[in-house]
């Protein structure tokens, strides 16, 4: 039985693509071990998947403050030492880095000890850990084109139920009436969307007003309900959406942030979007993610500092379904539906090469 060590953590944008690849290889009989931070999001998500875990306490490489800078060498040494111990214990056939700070100590130690290392960079701007590790990795892959010098563009792995949604033309057939708009704030919500969308809807005459499904995040659902009530508009307001594939499939337009996984899902489904990048993302990578779809005609890119109720209302009022169908098809044309397979295949090839 071959063993894959997945290194990923910090955000769902790193964790869920890693799970997609892990599941593909587990289905082929591989043993999966996950290296992450016991205090990170991965500690809440990964164990329920049934993977073995290898915890390493390691946090941000960058940050402000004298204490953080002074402690960085110590944190690096501790992280390297813990990762080294885990690698020697696990003895993986291949190490897969899917992003997040946790990939740095594990990736460096894997390269030092000669274990095959595959890197996958999800964002349009490579993170610090992957920029360093790309120089020592055996295979470098990316979710967007031209991210790292020697990276092969394979796309971002998405869940099978999302990748298998019907094509835009089939979904749009027979639709009529108000536009169907899906607003996605993510697990934590996006306060600016929660505040602006109901105000924008109130500016659109009732007969032209879109029907809205608005996902707010658990902590912001009460504030969202109050915002819709104050604006005098209605919507299907939810703290979370269980079936994202169905939600995407039913939408004419999605309003959301521009995380790498979100952009990959929008392309995989083939759905028009209005992307409002999170302005404080590291290296402003969400703007780059959004620009990729926008430049190919699949999305509108609206910086947060340009977002207000009047501007959003004007955009929504100007859209029609044929236009959104065309955007959906442009988005779908940028999809990489075999991304999971491509990353898994890279792991298999390196494992076979090591065996030989």
Swiss-Prot record:
Record InterPro entries: GlcNAc_MurG (IPR006009), Glyco_trans_28_C (IPR007235), GlycoTrans_28_N (IPR004276)
GO molecular function: UDP-N-acetyl-D-glucosamine:N-acetylmuramoyl-L-alanyl-D-glutamyl-meso-2,6-diaminopimelyl-D-alanyl-D-alanine-diphosphoundecaprenol 4-beta-N-acetylglucosaminlytransferase activity; undecaprenyldiphospho-muramoylpentapeptide beta-N-acetylglucosaminyltransferase activity
Gene name of the encoded protein: murG
NCBIfam families in the record: murG
GO terms of biological process kind: carbohydrate metabolic process; cell division; cell wall organization; lipid glycosylation; peptidoglycan biosynthetic process; regulation of cell shape
Family: Belongs to the glycosyltransferase 28 family. MurG subfamily.
CDD domains referenced in this protein's UniProt entry, alphabetically: GT28_MurG
Annotated metabolic or biological route of this protein: Cell wall biogenesis; peptidoglycan biosynthesis
Compartment annotation: Cell inner membrane
Membrane topology, from the record: Peripheral membrane protein
Function of the molecule: Cell wall formation. Catalyzes the transfer of a GlcNAc subunit on undecaprenyl-pyrophosphoryl-MurNAc-pentapeptide (lipid intermediate I) to form undecaprenyl-pyrophosphoryl-MurNAc-(pentapeptide)GlcNAc (lipid intermediate II).
Protein name (database record): UDP-N-acetylglucosamine--N-acetylmuramyl-(pentapeptide) pyrophosphoryl-undecaprenol N-acetylglucosamine transferase
Keywords assigned by UniProt, alphabetized: Cell cycle, Cell division, Cell inner membrane, Cell membrane, Cell shape, Cell wall biogenesis/degradation, Glycosyltransferase, Membrane, Peptidoglycan synthesis, Transferase
Positions annotated to bind UDP-N-acetyl-alpha-D-glucosamine: 11-13, 123, 159, 187, 241, 260-265, 286
Organism: Azoarcus sp. (strain BH72)
Biological classification of the source: Bacteria, Pseudomonadati, Pseudomonadota, Betaproteobacteria, Rhodocyclales
